[in-house]
Every structure is written in structure tokens, then in C-alpha cells.
Amino acid sequence: QRSEILLMALTGNQGKSGGGLRVAAWWELDGQRALWGGGSGPAWMTATEKLGLLYKAKIGGGLSWREFENLAVKSKEYRGGIPLMSFLYAHGGYKEIWDSPAFHDPALPRPTAAYMKEAVDKGWIPVRPLPGIDPKVYYFTGMNPLRRWPAPQIAQKHLWPKLAMIASVNTKLSTSSLMGDIVLPAAGWYERDLIKYTEAYIPYVVLNGKVVEPLGESKSEWEISGLLAKKIQERARARGVTTVRDAAMKGEVDLPPAYDKWTRDGKYRETDPRAALDEILLNSKLTGNKGYDEAAKTGVLPVVHAEGGPAPLWALGTRYRQGRTVFPHERFVLEKEAWPTYSGRQQFLIDHPWFEEAGEALPVHKEPPKAGGDHPLLLTGGHTRWSIHAIWRDSSLMLRLQRGEPVAYVSVKDARERNVADGDRIRVFSDVGEFEVMAKVGFSVRPGQVIVYHAWEPYQFKGWKGQQEPVAAPFKPLHMAGDYGQIHYRGIYSGPGHHPRAQRVNFARAGSV
């Protein structure tokens, strides 16, 4: 991405319609701040800091991008959220594969463990729970970690036994739900009222209207969270529990009034989300302060006004008005606002010690590391065209449009060398794991490549060993660097991630050695 952005800068394709690199950005519904009555600032701020924040918001024209980033970086010390990779490294047992130097960039002069220790010691990357304290409860909504995480067998071996409770909120029995303890069935599409998504690829906020009642015992996530808050309050009062330490171990959470706070002292009810949705929309300048009933008439609200200032999910930096296309970074390029970088400009030289010792102070091409072992083929993927995501990947109707089961696309040359014909079952393997799948020999597949499209559930494979089993996907240690302008971690920004592309594998006919 650094190289792509450099190319755009060199060709003058930043800050104008049709230009710029945008991976993901969301319209900020400013009314969400009013939902819980956020007050004058986060609880961890001093009175002086809260006063300064209030002045900036009301009189000083708002925070600059750099001021916002500085505040967001500081807030990570007080929040429970952390990057997934540091959690799996510390608590999931992934050290056993990610510490292997053979799986990483050979230019790195130090092992992953050394980078992790320095990043944690310097406060660049948080680890929650703190090292030495095992996680006890894993509660996830809509997620499917045993399908998405690299080498999920590692998590099942090391993380799952530590957990006293695994609870899933889901619309279907995903692999992860089936491998958990409790499934709270969630209402499906058109069985609940909600704001569906606010991604800034289109100039609209999209809603989802309830037209039928939820099936069986399923409930909306709104109702589920409200009922959990009610039960937590009930049990805390019955047991005489007052406060508990928060996830960051920096503050306390008051449990006896949990439900009262959730409902804003009765303002909202878990059985009716419309009051909350109405408050969000009525307080959102973004969509013209129109309420939910008006929005529900068409199912969408046009975006009418966006200043493009800093916000947790906002990554465009462009003032939007109706009739314009949506594109990023106008405020930095045309209005000359300082970029939130070390230099205040578009910056491609990163003279951070970690980047320098890895030979990446400037954008540079490197071949994919031999993650998974020294094998001759690269496992890649793509976005499935048949099911959109895992939610419909096991639909009998969708499966009729293809082979009816998971398939791996392999080249004619690689198949011939391994005595594999179209439709044969093959074993795709690395040093980390393996899975069995049907081979689909394709003339358009490049030799040296194995393609498995995403979203297959592990339970659709033999022995529940899915396509992620041989994927080591070690994170890049440089992504834990901090204390250098734009190079830092905070919620929904930067941090180490797994990239399960170009992973080293081989394949053979199933049953062969």
C-alpha cells in the first residue's frame, strides 16, 4: 500500500475525484454520541483535559487530525480492545509457529519475540488480559474465529482449554458456535430494525426494516445485549458485587446499575430499538437530523453534510456535499491541513529504527516469506461469488451452482506433475497443517498457485479441517512499531494483522504419502 500511495502522489492523484487510496471508511453518525450521554469526555481524562476538549469542540473549531490521533493513542491505555494478533500471541499459543524465523522476512535481524517484548514494554501494543492472567470467557457476536483465524487448530489446542465459557451470538450454527458452549440465536435480516451499514463507498446511510417476527427463540442483538445487562445487574445486586476491574486494569466497572445505565434510566427498552435508532438519527447532522420513521419510508437516508474531520472510523478527510463524488484527502491536499504524520506531509521515508533495520525506510518490494515452510506452491484466495460470505456458504441452493463442496483450483501443469485429475480429492499441506479438498484443474490457474475461495466452513471439510489449517500467516513485526507520528496503534487503526495470502503449501492425491 505504501508503494500504491507513493505512485498516486507522484502522479498527482490524491485529494480529487477519482483519486486516492481508500481501504475502508465509514460515515460517522454523530448522533451515536448522544445515545449514551457521553458527557464532557472519557472518564480517564483529567478535569483540565476535559475542559480543553470541550473548548476545542465548542469554540476552537474542533480537534486537528494530529490532536485527535494523540488523544486516540493515549486512550488505548484505558480501553480493553487490543489487536487480535497480540492476543493470540500472548494467550492463544501462536508463539509456537510465529516465533519461527523461517516463516518471516529473512532481512529481519531479530526474532518476533524480541519485537513483541519491546512493543509491549514501551506501551506501543497492549495485551489484554495482562500477561500471566488467562482469559476465562470468550463472547463474540457474528464472528467465526475458527473459520477466519490462521491455523485455528492452534487456538483449539491452547486457547479453548483456558476458557471456562465460550458464548456466541449468531444467526446460524457456525463452526465456532458449534465448538462453543452457548449459542444465543440472533434474529436474521428483515427480522429486526437497525442501521445496516454506513460505509462511505456510497452517499447514503442504509437501514434495515423489520417485516417479520424472529424465528423461534432468536432475538435482535439489541435485545440480547439489553437482557444480558439486566441479568448482570440482577445477579450483581443479589450477590453483593459492587465494582470490578475493567479489562485494561486501569479503572472499575460499576455492575449494580448496569441495566439502568444501558436503558438511560428507562429511556430505552430492549424490546424496542426504535427509540434508540430515532435518537441516533435525529442527532445526526450527517443525514439532516431526520428521524427513524422518515428514514424507514425508503430504507436509506442521503448523506447531506460531512465536514470530513477526524473521528474513530472516518478516514476520508474530505468535506462532502450532495451532488459530489466521495473521495479521500481533499482537506489535506487542497485545503493544506497538516496530515497526521510525523512530518505533517505525505510521508514515504520512515526513519523509525525498526523500519531502517529491516531495510524498509522507503517502500520496497520483497518476496513473500516462506510462511508455512519451504514448499513450492503459493496458496491464495479470492472473494467467493456464490455466497457473498460464510452466511450462505452451506446453502444447498448456492452449492448447486458449483461442485457442491469445497474445491481448490490448481494449474494443469501442477496437477499433471502430481498425477491429479479434475475431480480428484487432494491433500493440501504445509508444515503447520493440512486439509482435504476436491481439485478443480483450471487452464487459467498460474503454475505454482493453489486457489481456494473464501468463506467455506471448516465443517464442510473432512474432519472439520478447513482451508486455514496450513496457513501460518505470521504478522509482520514492523506493524507493532510505535512512537513515530503516524506509526502507532490505537483502536481501529494500524496494529499487527494476519494476511493469509501467498502461504507456502504443496498438494498430493489424497491417500498418497
Predicted regions and their residues:
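Hydrophobic alpha-helical scaffolding
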Residues: 1, 128, 145, 149, ...
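Long, contiguous, secondary-structure-rich segments that constitute the structural scaffold
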Residues: 221-289, 390, 395-409, 413-513
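Extended redox/cofactor-interaction regions of prokaryotic respiratory oxidoreductases
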Residues: 5-178, 297, 302-418
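Flexible glycine/proline-rich, aromatic-decorated loop/lid segments
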Residues: 175-207
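Active-site proximal loops enriched in glycine and acidic residues that flank catalytic Cys/His/Asp
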Residues: 25, 141-142, 169-171, 186-188, ...
